[in-house]
Curated annotation (Swiss-Prot):
It comes from the Bacteria. Residues 4-120 form the MTTase N-terminal domain. [4Fe-4S] cluster 1 binds at C13, C49, C83. It is an enzyme of class 2 (transferase). PROSITE patterns: MTTASE_N (PS51449), MTTASE_RADICAL (PS01278), RADICAL_SAM (PS51918). It catalyses: L-aspartate(89)-[ribosomal protein uS12]-hydrogen + (sulfur carrier)-SH + AH2 + 2 S-adenosyl-L-methionine = 3-methylsulfanyl-L-aspartate(89)-[ribosomal protein uS12]-hydrogen + (sulfur carrier)-H + 5'-deoxyadenosine + L-methionine + A + S-adenosyl-L-homocysteine + 2 H(+). Its cofactor is [4Fe-4S] cluster. It holds the Pfam family UPF0004. One of its GO terms (cellular component) is cytosol. InterPro entries: Elp3/MiaA/NifB-like_rSAM (IPR006638), Methylthiotransferase (IPR005839), Methylthiotransferase_CS (IPR020612), Methylthiotransferase_N (IPR013848), Methylthiotransferase_N_sf (IPR038135), NA-bd_OB-fold (IPR012340), Ribosomal_uS12_MeSTrfase_RimO (IPR005840), rSAM (IPR007197). This is Ribosomal protein uS12 methylthiotransferase RimO. The keyword Metal-binding applies. Its main location: cytoplasm.
Length: 432
């Protein structure tokens, strides 16, 4: 039987990336090869994102481009997997008969069979990395039990399912053998890890067990404010290789909007949580995400959010305009804020955050920081501090002088200048 040469395009979030890496490891074990150029492949496989409208449009555009290559005879097979396929399989099957198969988020064995590979249980922990070799993600759970009204993830990914701790430790050990030095923990909701399996949250225990391994940085992403286990913050202080960093998407602060979003938390409770976290670990840096233009959001409610951000002074912040997603519960509400107004509010909020970020970064000037080198361009090393997650946060641009520096190395850097989203300086020592 002919073994396919596959071009895999993985779109969307880091959770999707992990799914693609699992698929690749399974397929390669069956003799499938992968290429980075679509024109050299005989099969195209697209792992889609369907979370917001822009992501859907990108996924559809890539699907149509793949269909065109099939029509031209460049490739013989096109398969679609992931979130968009989970939501719109019936519609896409009718509109795109050229596609050889559609597979949802929980159909890896069937997808492998379609491309001439076999799923093997013993390879579940194995992944072929799509990230730089020194960085990886550990997906500690699937699905989501929250009922945020703006979100379709529970419909796409199903109920919350923690991965067994021993399995995660085996997977982490394999990543360590591959040379991964920074491990980023992800899930739709990392806060309640383990509750479904062990009857109690086990996130701190997992972090400590991972900390006993040889990763230099372990980072926690996608924590949910309700039910967040504060003992995790203590672990950050106690364990040198658990980053003093927390990604805690809040979405909003106004109580009426939080109720309409079904977030399960109030503004007062949110402020208390943030104050408690910072008091327990003064060195922590907080990242959050805000959603503007939610149905019914008034100018006064948006101004309240702006004041909240100015008061809380988040170290890292992303902001998105509300997307009226037909598969989300909030689709039943009237989308009252015009698209132009949503974008104006997003820009206004990010302008405020830029000012805050610039002032926060000035505190690093004159200091020496440990950084991880992600990239080398000439005599400039592009790096991150422990306070910066891959892809979404600040970067450091550092001169190397006479020092020989490679990607994936930890170094000491003297910071001389800063801006809102960058630090500039010089590498003073290579720490290996």
């Amino acid at each position: 039987m002919k073994k396919h040469n596959v071009f895999l395009l993985s779109l969307g979030c880091s959770k999707n990336t992990v799914d693609s890496e699992r698929l690749m490891a399974q397929a390669e074990a069956s003799g499938i090869t992968f290429t980075e150029e679509a024109d050299l492949a005989d099969t195209i496989l697209i792992n889609t994102c369907g979370f917001i409208e822009d992501a859907k449009e990108e996924s559809i555009a890539e699907i149509l481009a793949a269909v065109e290559k099939k029509t031209q005879g460049i490739v013989s097979g096109v398969y679609v997997m992931g979130c968009l396929s989970e939501l719109y399989r019936t519609e896409m099957r009718e509109e795109l008969p050229e596609i050889d198969g559609f597979f949802g988020t929980r159909e890896l064995p069937a997808l492998l069979q379609a491309i001439g590979a076999q799923y093997r249980d013993e390879l579940y922990d194995h992944r072929s990395l799509l990230t730089p070799p020194h960085i990886s993600y550990l997906k500690i759970a699937e699905g989501c039990n929250r009922s945020c009204s703006f979100c379709s993830i529970p419909k796409i990914r199903g109920r919350y399912r923690s991965q067994p701790m021993e399995q995660l430790l085996r997977e982490a050990a394999l990543l360590q053998k591959k040379g991964v030095r920074e491990l980023n923990l992800i899930a739709q909701d990392t806060s309640i890890y383990g509750r479904d399996l062990y009857g109690t949250p086990m996130l701190r225990e997992l972090l400590v067990r991972l900390s006993d391994m040889e990763f230099r940085w372990i980072r926690l992403l996608y924590a949910y404010p309700l039910d967040f286990p504060l003992e995790v913050i203590t672990a950050m202080s106690e364990r040198k290789n658990i980053c003093n960093y927390l990604d805690l998407p809040l979405q909003h602060c106004n109580d009426r909007i939080l109720r309409s979003m079904n977030r399960g938390i109030t503004k007062t409770e949110t402020v208390r949580l943030l104050d408690t976290i910072r008091a327990a670990n003064p060195d922590i840096r907080l990242r959050t995400t805000m959603l503007v233009g939610f149905p019914g959001e008034t100018r006064a409610e948006f101004d309240e959010l702006m004041q909240f951000i100015e008061t809380m002074r988040f170290d890292r912040l992303g902001c998105f305009p509300y997307c009226h997603e037909e598969h989300a519960p909030s689709y039943a509400l009237e989308d009252t804020v015009k698209a132009e107004e949503k974008e104006e509010r997003r820009a206004e909020l990010m302008e405020l955050q830029e000012t805050i970020a610039k002032e926060n970064n000035q505190l690093f000037e004159g200091k020496e920081l440990t950084v991880l080198i992600d990239q080398i361009e000439g005599d400039i090393a592009i790096a991150r501090t422990e306070y910066d997650a891959p892809e979404v946060d600040n970067e450091c641009y550092l001169t190397t002088g006479s020092l020989r520096v490679g990607t994936g190395e930890f170094c000491t850097a003297h910071i001389s200048e800063s801006s809102a989203y960058e630090l500039h300086g010089t590498i003073t020592a290579v720490n290996g």
